[in-house]
Amino acid sequence: SKEKVELEKIDALYEQYNSTKDEVQRKAIYKKIDSVSGVAAKYAIANEYDKMMSAMGAQGTNAFTSFEQTVYTDDIPSASLDKYLAVQAERFRNPVLRIFHTELEAVYEEKNRTLDNDGRKVSETLFSNLFQKHNYGLQTTIGTVEHLKNPSLIEIRKYFNKYYVPNNMGIILSGDFNPDEVIAKVDKAFSYMQPKPFDKYTFQPEDAITAPIVKEIIGPDAENLTIGYRLPGNKDKDALLADLVGQILTNGRAGLLDLNLVKKQKLLRASAFTYSLIDYGILYLSAAPTSGQSLEDVKALVLNEIENLKKGNFDDQLIT
C-alpha cells in the first residue's frame, strides 16, 4: 500500500537518526521524519483506534507498563464483545506504528517530569540500591534519556515478535457474559497466534544487606523519610507474611503507625505497604516529620514501631 511505503521510509530514517551523532544532522533527519509522517498520515484515519472504541461504547481505553507487565485496558458493553475481540485480534496481529514519533514526544514529557519529581527520585534510588544485580534496580521502566533519544522501530518490532506470543500473554475479562461462550470466541479470534520460545529473564541473586544503606535526595518537596526492606518474590510463602506485616503497621485506621504515630500526632504522616514482584519485593515505609522534628527523630519513631511488631505489641484483632 501507499502508506506502507511511507512507513518503511520512517523506519529507515529512525535507523539513520540513531547512528548519527551530529546534532545538526539529527535535527535535519527528524525534520524528514516529521515530513514523511505527514505524508503517511494522509492514508490513515486519525485516532482510528479511539474512534472504533468510542463507536462500540468503550470507556477507559488506556495502557501502562510496569516492571513485569504491559497491560492494555478497555471497559466495554457486553453487547460489543464480538466487535471488540475482532478489533483486538487485528490490533495484535501486525501493529502499525503510525504515530510513533508523536507518542515518543509524550513519553519524553513524562520522562522530563520524573527528573524533577522527588517521589520518583526516591523510588528509583531505593530500587537501585536494594537491587544491584536485578533489572528492578539496574534500569527503570521508562528508560534513560539516551534510550528515548535513540529509538528504533525495527528493534521495537523485533521485541513485539519475540515477546507478544500466546505463551507470554493473558486475556483477562470480567463482567456480564457466559464464560464458556466467551472463551470459545477468544480462542477463535486469536487462533492465528502460535506459541514461540522466548528468553526468560535470568539474574544473579542479590547479596545480603549487612548494614543500612543511607541515601539523601535533594529536591523542592518537604522533608520526609523512606525506608525499604528487600523481600522475597511473590511466590515465596514469606511474601504473604510480608503483606500481613504491612497491614499490621498501617491500614488507615488501627495499624501500629496509625495508632501510635499519626493519631497521637507524633508524626505528620506514616504508612507502610508491600510492593510484591515476581523475583523480589519491598516493604516500603514512608513518614513525614511534624514541626521541629529531624529525620533522625522520624526514623527512631518508625523503627520503634518495627520493634513493637517484632515483640507482638499489637492488638490480636489485626490478624484475625
Residue ranges and their predicted role:
Residues 1-2, 227, 237-249, 257-259:
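Active/ligand-binding-proximal structured segments within catalytic/core domains
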Residues 95-98, 115-116, 132-137, 141, ...:
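An aromatic/glycine/proline-enriched structural segment found at the starts
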Residues 148-152:
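Short, charged, amphipathic alpha-helices and their helix-cap/turn boundaries
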Residues 1-90, 121-146, 168-174, 223-233, ...:
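M16 family metallopeptidases and their MPP-like homologs
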Residues 33, 96-112, 178, 198-211, ...:
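Acidic/histidine-enriched alpha-helical segments
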